[in-house]
């Protein structure tokens, strides 16, 4: 969420103002409640997102979200639940979205996705089972790892790092699924 998304204080409903206070916020402009008793500051911190490079029978599962254009396939992603570790969160997301069971979950890396104000925690997930997509996904592909083509945004960098660690050559594409 960007600061433009907030117009009113979520605590007391007063209109928010902007403040740049080098002592408290390092000089960054923040939206704040003008009521000193309330004291709300909208920090606009990045949202943690988990992503999975799902490996099933030696192939990587890429899926198309129902909201995406035809031909656009990417990694399984999702948000953490309160009190959930990232490892448990990605195992849950993989199961919820594909019905696959995470057998092994290994950290690939942590990546910025500034455009969406997200911090992506990416994992390689070795999975088992039979794919059954959730309603939010329309279709999937199982791709041989050497044929993967990472994209220059968000989870694409995680896929590139995973491929690089396995000695796989690749070229970046503009968007997922190309």
Which residue stretches match the model-derived regions?
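Active-site-adjacent beta-strand/loop module that shapes the phosphate/pyrophosphate-binding cleft
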Residues: 111-132, 145, 162-163
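NUDIX/MutT-family hydrolases
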Residues: 133-164
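Acidic, metal-coordinating catalytic segment for phosphate/diphosphate chemistry
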Residues: 2-51
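Conserved Nudix-box catalytic region and its N-terminal flanking loop in Nudix hydrolases
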Residues: 46-49, 55-96
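Charged phosphate-binding loop/patch that engages nucleotide di/tri-phosphates or the phosphate backbone
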Residues: 161-178
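A short coil-to-beta-strand element that immediately follows conserved catalytic motifs
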Residues: 19-20, 100-109
């Amino acid at each position: 969420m960007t600061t433009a998304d907030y117009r009113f204080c979520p605590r007391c409903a007063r209109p928010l103002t902007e403040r740049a206070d080098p002592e408290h916020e390092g000089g960054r402009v923040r939206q704040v409640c003008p009521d000193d008793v309330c004291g709300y500051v909208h920090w606009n911190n990045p949202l943690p997102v988990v992503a999975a490079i799902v490996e099933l029978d030696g192939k990587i599962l890429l899926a198309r979200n129902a909201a995406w254009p035809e031909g656009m396939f990417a990694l399984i992603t999702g948000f953490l639940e309160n009190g959930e570790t990232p490892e448990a969160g990605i195992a849950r997301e993989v199961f919820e979205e594909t019905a696959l069971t995470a057998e092994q979950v290994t950290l690939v890396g942590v990546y910025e996705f500034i455009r969406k104000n997200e911090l992506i925690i990416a994992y390689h997930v070795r999975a088992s089972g039979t794919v059954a997509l959730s309603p939010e996904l329309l279709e999937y592909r199982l791709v041989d790892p050497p044929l993967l083509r990472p994209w220059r945004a968000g989870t694409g960098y995680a896929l590139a790092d995973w491929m690089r660690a396995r000695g796989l050559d690749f070229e970046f594409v503009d968007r997922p699924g190309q």
